């Protein structure tokens, strides 16, 4: 009879100052209650009753009642892809003694180009030619130089076509320019 009264007193009217179920101690039956698990006391605490794998935080998180059908009418939905639980910490017998004498690793790179030879080995024939094998007064190849007058070509001495009133270039003009440049180039070698 006493328990039925407590169940009926759970529905508090809005605006009253009575005690309500607040989050740290109670949780809503929806997705927020799944994600943020409230504080709960463990009833199995005492001598000989402590099993960390059965009554811990990880156990409570894995045993939340959820539904894989989807989120409808406040139902708690399960995680679609559960995280893989990995035990990365080795047990006490797996630890090994570190001995720095045995751990000598070969470097896979040389810092500051240490392995580069200090002096380059050049073949002596090409870099140090014998006397008489070259001409020190060798001239660079000749370039075409038009008759110049104050930094620009002197067109009075260069053969040109007569000026026309029509500015269009004919194919004969192009042939004449090609021939003039060819004659100037060949005159460097055949004078």
UniProtKB/Swiss-Prot annotation:
Domain of life: Eukaryota
Pfam family, one: SHIPPO-rpt
Role: During primary cilia disassembly, involved in cilia disassembly. Required specifically to control cilia retraction as well as the liberation and duplication of the basal body/centrosome. May act by stimulating AURKA activity at the basal body in a cell cycle-dependent manner.
GO CC terms of this entry: ciliary basal body; cytoplasmic vesicle; nucleus; trans-Golgi network
InterPro entries for this protein: CIMAP3, SHIPPO-rpt
Protein name: Ciliary microtubule-associated protein 3
Organism: Homo sapiens
UniProt main location, coarse: cytoplasm
Subunit and partners: Interacts with proteins involved in ciliary transport, including ARL13B, CETN1, KIF3A, RAB6A, RAB8A, TUBB1 and TUBG1. Interacts with AURKA.
Keywords from the named record: Cilium biogenesis/degradation, Cytoplasm, Cytoplasmic vesicle, Golgi apparatus
Single Gene Ontology BP annotation: embryonic heart tube left/right pattern formation
Location in the cell: Cytoplasmic vesicle; Golgi apparatus, trans-Golgi network; Cytoplasm
Disulfide bonds: none
GO MF annotations, alphabetized: beta-tubulin binding; cytoskeletal protein binding; gamma-tubulin binding; kinesin binding; protein kinase binding; small GTPase binding
């Amino acid at each position: 009879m006493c328990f039925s009264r407590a169940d009926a007193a759970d529905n508090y009217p809005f605006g009253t100052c009575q005690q309500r179920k607040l989050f740290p101690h109670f949780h809503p039956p929806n997705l927020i209650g799944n994600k943020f698990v409230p504080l709960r006391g463990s009833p199995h605490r005492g001598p000989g009753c402590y099993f960390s794998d059965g009554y811990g935080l990880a156990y409570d998180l894995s045993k939340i009642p959820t539904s894989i059908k989807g989120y409808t009418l406040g139902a708690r939905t399960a995680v679609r892809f559960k995280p893989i639980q990995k035990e990365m910490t080795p047990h006490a017998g797996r630890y090994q003694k570190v001995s720095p004498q045995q751990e000598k690793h070969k470097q896979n790179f040389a810092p500051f180009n240490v392995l580069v030879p200090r002096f380059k080995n050049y073949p002596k024939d090409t870099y140090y030619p014998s006397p008489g094998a070259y001409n020190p007064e060798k001239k660079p190849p000749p370039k075409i130089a038009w008759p110049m007058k104050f930094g620009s070509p002197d067109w009075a001495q260069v053969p040109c076509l007569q000026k026309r009133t029509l500015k269009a270039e004919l194919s004969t003009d192009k042939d004449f320019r090609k021939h003039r440049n060819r004659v100037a180039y060949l005159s460097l070698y055949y004078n």
